[in-house]
A protein has these predicted regions:
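Charged, amphipathic alpha-helical segments and their flanking helix caps
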Residues: 1-30, 35-142
Length: 142
């Protein structure tokens, strides 16, 4: 399993959620993230960013590393926006939809926490941190 595959499966699962219809879901590894988030915030006043997963091995003594992949899903909104569907709402929906979600070929996602932060004068975000037990093979293998 490659970390990008986990990220793409999470993005696909969120894109299919009816309650998040119309909310752009951005995958961090797919090009210029800063401008894509700014464009989404400018057009839709909110978006969801699926960040690049991290990985903490519990064993790397073999050709396949076993451990925990950590993924952060950020629900971002304009601070001045009073429209229905705040970043907090989106984060709670994402946590609910993704917690215990089986990810084919990987395992089951588990929600670890939700936190908030102000990104700048115009935007704030709620981050949902998820983990999944998985193994990483050789990234050069197809």
């Amino acid at each position: 399993m490659k970390l990008l595959e986990i990220q793409e499966k999470i993005a696909a699962a969120l894109s299919a959620v009816e309650a998040l219809k119309g909310v752009p879901v951005i995958v961090e590894d797919k090009g210029d993230v800063k401008s894509r988030v700014a464009t989404a915030i400018g057009q839709a006043t909110r978006c969801i960013l699926v960040q690049t997963p991290g990985f903490k091995p519990t064993s790397s003594a073999s050709k396949v590393m076993v451990g925990t992949a950590q993924v952060v899903v950020m629900a971002i909104q304009k601070i001045v926006t009073t429209a229905k569907g705040t970043a907090q709402d989106m984060a709670e929906i994402a946590a609910w939809e993704l917690n215990l979600l089986p990810v084919e070929g990987v395992g089951v996602l588990v929600c670890r926490d939700i936190s908030s932060q102000v990104l700048n004068d115009e935007a704030l975000a709620y981050s949902v941190r998820l983990e999944v037990q998985t193994s990483l093979g050789n990234p050069l293998d197809n």
